[in-house]
């Protein structure tokens, strides 16, 4: 059976800003749950992993930067959207032989994420 990833969370100084950033780029649906100090994120699609964005309630060090890859059909178009929304491209495009290619970017708070385009079969 394995151990599939079933959820993700981003710790953020400004959850509303970060949620808006990802919603604009990927069309993710974000539901603000103020009673939980939490934003539930639905990524859509079959087999997608949903998650949440939260502002830590306690001061101190936050957990380490989390990196996950988001499947897209056009790396160049998403790079353009990321820049327009205030993000920065860190790795333009890199091939993974026999598998596909990826881009690494940071959101407005400097959190690194990846875009993934699988090789056409």
Model region roles, listed by residue range:
Residues 28-63, 112-117:
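Conserved short beta-strand elements that form part of the metal-binding/catalytic scaffold
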Residues 22:
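Catalytic core of tubulin tyrosine ligase-like
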Residues 1-19, 47-48, 65-68, 117-121:
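N-terminal beta-strand motif that seeds the catalytic metal site of vicinal oxygen chelate
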Residues 5-13, 31, 58-121:
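Vicinal oxygen chelate
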Residues 7, 40, 52, 92, ...:
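Conserved beta-strand positions that form and line the central face of beta-propeller blades
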């Amino acid at each position: 059976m394995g151990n599939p990833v079933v959820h993700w969370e981003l710790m953020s100084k400004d959850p509303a800003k970060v949620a808006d950033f990802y919603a604009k780029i990927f069309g993710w649906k974000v539901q603000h749950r103020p009673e939980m100090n939490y934003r539930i994120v639905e990524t859509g699609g079959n087999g997608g992993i949903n998650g949440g964005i939260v502002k830590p309630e306690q001061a101190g060090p936050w957990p380490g930067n989390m990196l996950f890859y988001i499947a897209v059909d056009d790396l160049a178009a998403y790079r353009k959207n990321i820049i327009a929304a205030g993000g920065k491209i860190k790795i333009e495009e890199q091939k993974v032989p026999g598998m596909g290619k990826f881009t690494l970017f940071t959101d407005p708070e400097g959190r690194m994420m990846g875009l993934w385009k699988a090789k056409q079969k």
